[in-house]
Amino acid sequence: AAGGIGQALALLLKNRLPAGSDLALYDIAPVTPGVAADLSHIPTPVTIKGYAGEDPTPALEGADVVLVSAGVARKPGMDRADLFNVNAGIVKALAETIAVVCPKACVGIITNPVNTTVPIAAEVLKKAGVYDKRKLFGVTTLDVIRSETFVAALKDKDPGQVRVPVIGGHSGVTILPLLSQVEGVTFTDEEVAALTKRIQNAGTEVVEAKAGGGSATFSMGQ
């Protein structure tokens, strides 16, 4: 929760969760309680606490929804698969704790590479006997909002009125925007090819623009 995505997401949730909700932030970084203290000053009816250290148990107790954004971010020249060796272990450890502390929670995996971290979490939950396919999912909405933004810009439309289904997970060439299903617009073959390529490489565009300073965080938090 102390990382770029975690902080952006925490801000969004502090402002948008229903009144009376409890929001728990967890990170191994000691700054996490400070992030929560900062966000607690926003005048919304959402209670927020931050937890730091090696054990996520206090943050997970009683959780109905768990969003996992922990892990290392991409740097220029890396693709999402390069993150596997580090991030797979992080997701595995968190899933093991979730299986014990809040086995009935809905679990959303943001940590890349999503196409492989989600199956890892699934196997951990299966081994613990608490797997429910309805309650474990990969968060790939970023590809949808990117698609809607790019299509709207190309076709001079209101981004809020454009809907683009995206399938295939969140791993480079597997990202497939279904442009033929966008209502009210048509595309040439050249536009389809160019849009698809840009959507698939949008994450790399951000990583390179940040020049080693991180990956997509604000748009991911949204």
Swiss-Prot record:
Signal peptide per UniProt: none
Catalytic activity annotation: (S)-malate + NAD(+) = oxaloacetate + NADH + H(+)
Binding site for NAD(+): 1-6, 27, 87, 110-112, 220
Result when mutating residue 194 to V: In strain: 523-80
GO BP field: malate metabolic process; tricarboxylic acid cycle
MF annotations from Gene Ontology: L-malate dehydrogenase (NAD+) activity
Catalytic machinery residues: 170 (proton acceptor)
Any Pfam family matching the protein: Ldh_1_C
Name of the top EC class for this enzyme: oxidoreductase
Positions with a binding annotation for substrate: 74, 80, 112, 146
Keyword Cell cycle: no
The enzyme's E.C. designation: 1.1.1.37
Function, as annotated: Catalyzes the reversible oxidation of malate to oxaloacetate.
Record text on subunit structure and interactions: Homodimer.
Family designation: Belongs to the LDH/MDH superfamily. MDH type 1 family.
Name this polypeptide is given: Malate dehydrogenase
Organism: Vibrio mimicus
